[in-house]
């Protein structure tokens, strides 16, 4: 369906692809992976013709329809979310638009002399609309939006009043309703709550077309794809299997290549040693010459070019008291909406609570109450003895000094740390080389989030309160964070929609539902086993 043949591509001074090739065949569901900046979005744009390769070609079979979802959703306003979604439904939306025009023409007194032709055309268009299942389009659009957690009021309200994250969902719904032959989805899991994520996962698993997608959510990708295309050192490497298979195969390939490299280096060293030893002796001249020629003809094995992710290690945090957080008889409301009413909750040392709940259940509110960013209407929230808190929330990016560079920000925050540890810290969170000289104001939201996280974790607290800490982190950086936090000896209270993160780090679950608040003594994996669902909104 789509062939990428020997493409080379350079952006400014950065080489993205060097004679790279890959293919997307009918029915394949492919995960596109690679570090930030490797060229994933550029590859999508070349497939849809918005960019061209410098060399080589990208070809799409004739008649193949493509739906492309990107993070740049453009302007939306002046109509409902349902209308916006239906408008992107491919041919059926165009047929629907013509039907509406013909219906208006049929009641237009100025066009009475054209009526026979209008009625004849209306019959043709109506038949085509029925053939495309157009009368079910509104229902299908609402079904998709409901899957992405839209309420009826949000579906019918002005799309322009929605936040950026909800507009992203509208843009995604347009592509899903379109059901093209090929879907290109660039980070579809961004901005989704866990319930929406699981619904999208089921939708894509049942989708009969071909799929090429990127995602920073390991579990989401692993459950959908049957092939991985990896961008590595300008090449496109294909692996048949899911993401877990790819991880294992990649590690084996690297190990094999490293072994080959080391064996060849040992052989080369032996040959060079012989040449150096006997090159001055006439009696060994022919042997030396023979070995020199042999070395010249050998194809050199390169060491693995894998980008190494630096491990982050916590400095020892001061020990807190046994009772870390005590929430007693707390009530909290926003306007008429009651979030908590007589709520009690205790967090003890070394517990790792993940907070579960649908949108608006009060997850972030609880973290704000614990962090002191919000006050209860009634009751008390007490922090225990010797507790040193680190609080990560999305608004934390707003307090960064835009005129400072990344390194200046780290130096100002930790004036006694020294350059080497701070550079190592920056590297752990994806800022290497010249990146540390970027001014904060030019950083993306994801880069700012990583900088805030780095500052918070360098001088470690003994209580971490984390609101969606994995947003914007790529797969490698997220894995580094999981490994680091698994070694953290303090207490954690966190919200995340990343199931891999939840399963790896939690040992307690607090589930907030309309029926009440439920506590589970095991981690997320045990919660799923006990309840039979992966998210509170999926309760039967």
Regions found by a protein language model. Name each.
Residues 1-261, 308, 315-540:
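ABC ATP-binding cassette signature C-motif
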Residues 108-109, 274-286, 300-303, 430:
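Short intracellular "coupling" helices and adjacent cytoplasmic loop segments at the cytosolic face
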Residues 119, 192, 289-299:
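Extended non-transmembrane interhelical loops and adjacent amphipathic helices
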Residues 142-148, 273-277, 293-301:
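Short amphipathic coiled-coil heptad-repeat segments
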Residues 153, 266, 304-306:
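Short, flexible active-site-proximal loops enriched in glycine and acidic residues
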Residues 257-279, 284-293, 308-309, 529-540:
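ABC ATPase nucleotide-binding domains
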């Amino acid at each position: 369906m789509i062939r990428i043949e020997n493409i080379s591509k350079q952006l400014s001074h950065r080489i993205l692809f060097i004679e790279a090739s890959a293919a997307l065949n009918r029915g394949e569901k492919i995960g596109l992976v690679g570090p930030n900046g490797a060229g994933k979005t550029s590859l999508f744009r070349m497939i849809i013709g918005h960019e061209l390769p410098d060399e080589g070609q990208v070809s799409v079979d004739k008649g193949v329809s493509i739906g492309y979802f990107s993070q740049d959703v453009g302007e939306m306003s002046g109509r409902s979310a349902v209308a916006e979604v239906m408008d992107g439904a491919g041919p059926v939306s165009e047929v629907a638009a013509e039907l509406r025009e013909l219906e208006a023409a049929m009641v237009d007194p100025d066009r009475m002399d054209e009526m026979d032709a209008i009625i004849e055309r209306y019959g043709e268009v109506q038949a085509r609309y029925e053939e495309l299942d157009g009368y079910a389009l509104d229902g299908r659009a609402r079904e998709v939006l409901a899957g992405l957690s839209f309420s009826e009021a949000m579906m019918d309200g002005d799309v322009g009043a929605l936040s950026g994250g909800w507009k992203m969902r509208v843009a995604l719904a347009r592509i899903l309703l379109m059901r093209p032959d090929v879907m290109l989805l660039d980070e579809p899991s961004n901005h989704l709550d866990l319930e929406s994520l699981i619904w999208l996962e089921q939708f894509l698993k049942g989708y009969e077309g071909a799929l090429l997608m990127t995602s920073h959510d390991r579990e989401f990708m692993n459950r959908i794809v049957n092939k991985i295309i990896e961008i590595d050192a300008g090449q496109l490497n294909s692996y048949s299997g899911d993401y877990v298979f790819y991880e294992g195969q990649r590690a084996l390939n690297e190990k094999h290549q490293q072994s080959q490299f080391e064996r060849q280096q040992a052989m080369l060293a032996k040959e060079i040693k012989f040449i150096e030893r006997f090159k001055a002796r006439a009696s060994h001249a022919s042997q030396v010459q023979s070995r020199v020629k042999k070395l010249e003809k050998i194809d050199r094995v390169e060491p693995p070019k894998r980008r190494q992710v630096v491990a982050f290690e916590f400095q020892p945090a001061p020990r807190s008291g046994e009772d870390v957080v005590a929430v007693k008889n707390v009530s909290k409301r926003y306007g008429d909406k009651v979030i908590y009413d007589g709520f009690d909750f205790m967090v003890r040392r070394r517990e790792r609570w993940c907070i579960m709940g649908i949108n608006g259940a009060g997850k972030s509110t609880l973290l704000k109450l614990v962090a002191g960013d919000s006050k209860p209407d009634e009751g008390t929230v007490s922090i225990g003895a010797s507790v040193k808190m680190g609080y990560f929330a999305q608004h934390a990016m707003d307090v960064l000094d835009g005129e400072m560079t990344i390194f200046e920000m780290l130096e100002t925050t930790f004036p006694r740390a020294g350059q080497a540890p701070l550079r190592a810290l920056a590297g752990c969170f994806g800022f290497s080389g010249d990146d540390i000289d970027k001014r904060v104001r030019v950083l993306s939201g994801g880069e700012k989030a990583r900088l805030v996280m780095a500052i918070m974790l360098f001088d470690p607290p003994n209580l971490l309160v984390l609101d969606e800490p994995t947003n914007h982190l790529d797969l490698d950086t997220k894995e580094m964070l999981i490994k680091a936090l698994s070694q953290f000896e303090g207490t954690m209270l966190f919200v995340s929609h990343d199931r891999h993160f939840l399963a790896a780090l939690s040992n307690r679950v607090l589930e907030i539902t309309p029926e009440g608040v439920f506590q589970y003594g095991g981690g997320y994996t045990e919660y799923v086993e006990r309840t039979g669902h992966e998210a509170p909104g999926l309760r039967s």
